[in-house]
């Protein structure tokens, strides 16, 4: 019985299936962890959701920012962007079933036995695990309720960018969703920077990757995350696993087998384009 952690799929269904075949994944005995951003950019978002949903208890996933954006499009709050290639999913006969399932998925996974935590973007160093779990529950409760469109309408924005237990209402929920699904860099005091996306060696001072600032969670648990393709899976401290390696941009899909920490990769079926970083079919 093995635990496989896979980075952002982004609708790259064929690569996901090929990678699972490579590691001989068997849902009857193995468990699959997914770092979020199941959808958008790749051609197979519909197939990815159908497959992942079919795995039932054999999969543990977290929501990413693209998953939340898809839910906002589904709710009529945001417009579908052609580059996200979501039209087949939104027009599918089982779209309601799939997306209502998706909005009931968590923002945080914790395995106490493995001392392993997973979130799409990571864990802000301002939180201990108890705070992170409570914050995740706060957003999950709203997303799974009938009032979820009100949150999705208010989630877009970069403020507040500093955690306080005094935060309340939609401002609190926006910080939580940004920390779990959009965070990359922090100031030394833990305040989020929502603008910089470059690789750490190119980031302006005094910004640091969130994982470079010691925090209560990273001191006690391993953390797996996706979201940050420009890291290319490198440059993180021991116990911090960056799993997004840019499959939808022409990179590869990466899998970590937890038990022996062995990595497996599946090359993208797409090639890198020089046109504004977009990927085109090969």
Curated annotation (Swiss-Prot):
InterPro entries: ApaH, Calcineurin-like_PHP_ApaH, Metallo-depent_PP-like. Pfam families: Metallophos (PF00149). Coiled coil: none annotated. One of its GO terms (molecular function) is bis(5'-nucleosyl)-tetraphosphatase (symmetrical) activity. It comes from the Bacteria. Keywords: Hydrolase. Belongs to the Ap4A hydrolase family. This is Bis(5'-nucleosyl)-tetraphosphatase, symmetrical.
